[in-house]
Amino acid sequence: MSSSDLTGNFYKEFFIQNSTENATDAIKISLNQVDSYNRFNKGREIYIYLKGLFLVEVKSGDGVYTIGGNTKDGEVETLTSNRYPSHIFRSASTEMIIPKSVSILESKDIGIFVTFDKLEFPISSVGQPFVDPADDYDSHKTVQRCSGFSYYNFILETSSFASFKNEVLIDGGGSISGIVSKTYNGSELVLVLNTTEDVELNSSRCTLSDSNEFSVIFEDDFESYPNNLSITGVWNNFIEAGSKEWKIKTTTDSQNQGSKIAQIGAYNSGDSSNVAWLISPPINLDSQSIEFINFQSSNSFSDNSNLELLISTDWNATNSGIISATWSALPGIIVSDSESYQNWIDSSYIDLSAYSGTAFIAFKYTGGGTNNSGTFEIDNFQVITQN
């Protein structure tokens, strides 16, 4: 159990995750039962008898997969109070759930108990209650995290029925832990508290970096490349599976109209799988004290295709060594499927100070088949360092 309705911030639902620490998957259970914490408390190991149940999204297309008792119009319905005792069983074991450390909200973490550091509420919100008295159901409060030269903002969602709704947002910086979820209409990721004990803002507020103290050591806006051709030159353009590779295109998107961009997509490929890499030139992380990367991304024909931002410090710069190298995920913001195809999303400034040696940054696209053929686009890739 990663969530609890002890404080009333969850209603007739709970989330379970696949591990007490470093969880990678979670799922929602929808049941017609309030105060379920009396039997299914946070950290409780439970078993679910799946026969006769349904696994669908809460709202069609929202990505919040839920076990329920029935479906209607492609969406889940709750497991009734008469049925759930025959399907959900608790064990005698209750474990401590160690929150997964993250720096951005991502769909892959929905239902997982996560923690953010370097968080604070905007000064304008300090002293306000968690729930605005004018809100009937849920209140949204902005939380901000220092991310290089700007703030990464996301929403903390609180139910108007939560027992702590009248507690006020405090000043200071620190950590906040909660469950990654989505708004009622499924349009936006949010963080939801189990309890305000998981709000630990006991330190000073964070400080943004000064852009005047940094300079660019590598950048590429892709304007110098020939249009409609494969990307070559300093980038490594590698096809792991399928036939599609990264190419230069000129975008017509209103937010970036006329710019040349790096584009990948599996549409009309005819391949069951497409995996394509675009890997940066080497970055010497030992020549400077602090490095950040930044870029913008957009998409088209949003579906279940995927774009990952990765880093390696042991790749040998050969195509044959790409798969065997160690690649770690970086916490950059990549455009979501729900975003309009006209929009370009900033990655925020991604800190590379945890790495040393010679690093390579990779964009790895995975798609293919009839349901995973979406297009991703990258522009204005930049590596900066402190002077």
Where do the PLM segments sit?
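Extended, low-complexity, turn-rich repeat/linker tracts enriched in Gly/Pro/Ser/Thr and Asp/Glu
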Residues: 6-8, 123-127, 131, 271, ...
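Terminal, low-complexity interaction segments
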Residues: 333-387
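Extracellular beta-rich ligand/substrate-recognition surface
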Residues: 263-276, 336-343
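Extracellular beta-strand-rich recognition modules
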Residues: 50, 222, 280, 287-300, ...
